[in-house]
Amino acid sequence: LQFEKILDALPEWDHFYTVDELDQRTMTLAEKYPTKVTVTVEGQSRNGHPIHVIKIGEGKRTGLFYACPHPNEPIGSLVADHLAEILCQDDELLNNLDMTFYLIKCVDPDGTKMNEGWFKGPFTVENYARNFFRPASFEQVEWSFPVDYKTLHFDSPLPETKVLMKLIEDLHPDFIYSLHNAGFGGVYAYISKDLPAWYDTLYALAKKYDLPLSLGEPEMPYAIKLADAVYKFPSIKDAYEFLAENTDKDPGQIIRAGSSSYGYSQQFCNPLTLVCELPYFYDARVDNLSSSDVIRRDAVMARLERTEKLFASLKTEYDVVAEHITHTSSLRTAVEHYFETMPDNLQAEKSYAAKSPDMEKMATVAELFDNEAVNPFYHLLLLGMVLRLLDEARAKDPRPEFDAAIDAAESIFKAHHEAVVANLDYSVIPIRKLVGMQLGAGLEALAMI
């Protein structure tokens, strides 16, 4: 590892910064290093919050780092915040990297503020789920870049996305680091170019921080595996073709969203684009490659059937009060988008699992664990959003129908939470390890350009 000294000097964090705290730290940094730091406001969020871009260095190469591409993913905000500090403090590092850095600590401030209820802890599955928010796909900064592919036509980028579009168009970056993270599982990565030497550094970093690799089911069934826990950067076109092959519906009507920064950048440049996913919670089974006694296809199909049943019960409760929810909000849009698109996505996964030869083998313990335990964890997050939406609606219109719906949804949430926790032996990963892993992965990658 080339950057061991930097990683060993990382401080401890016991919480995540709020959007306002990140902004204040940016202003403080600019005041402390006025000759090294330039801060500009390159746009505003939908709610009018300024999006600050930090420029550091005058290198020949250009790197674009942006955090909170999904607002429930704040690990990268600490990475960007700390990287800005060390670039100002370490002239030798900045000169050796020969890169002009453009850093955005939070590209979705509105959505991130809606997650701040869990940023200070306690870091439990329940508190995370009850305070979780993730927008509908077409309102996600990462997936609202323009695209025109077959029947998929999307040209409604968010104001936040337009900030990234302009930076990509103007800078033609050599390196784009979209600072995502997962919720539960292990470390895995998406990369736009096949760099075997970097895979070794990823594994070395995971070993350094005692973090498991995610060796179970891939996040996306169509992801192309380059190495253990490393996948070729997916495109919206890949998602389209997967749906075209596995459903009888128009993929454009199922996706209803745009491209990513990676897809958009291909029109202007060919940057090394990286995502290093890592979780808040983990269980030792996520990287257990020993064989289970369950066929992988059976594990996947059982998971999809459980998802359908949960979806149906939740949709039934929601439909009772849906007509009374009259306000517009990002929570409502997210929940209703899930209800609208989930059946077709489940059908596509079923079709794929039924015919894929990869499903004929015995599932590893990691694959079985993903299907039986990790997937229900993510369903709990949807349940949390439904509860938040119902609370939001009742606050605007305190009618008894909402009381009954909230009681029913709360019962479903509690039962599902109990089942999820009973099936997990989870630990909370120290934030310092997560920051070190993601920061180290990025530094090692850009050094290979």
Model-derived regions, located:
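Short beta-strand-to-loop junctions in surface cap/lid or active-site-entrance loops
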Residues: 52-60
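Active-site/substrate-binding loop(s) of hydrolase catalytic cores
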Residues: 60-62, 75, 88-199, 203, ...
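Short glycine- and acidic-rich boundary segments immediately preceding or forming the N-terminal edge
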Residues: 1-51
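C-terminal accessory segments enriched in acidic
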Residues: 1-16, 156, 160, 196-449
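Short, well-ordered amphipathic alpha-helices
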Residues: 80-89
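Short glycine-rich or small-residue beta-strand-to-loop segments that form or flank ligand, phosphate
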Residues: 64-69
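Catalytic metal-binding/acid-base residues of hydrolase active sites
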Residues: 70, 108, 182, 219, ...
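Di-metal (Zn2+ and/or Mg2+/Mn2+) metal-binding site signature of metallo-dependent hydrolases
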Residues: 70-77
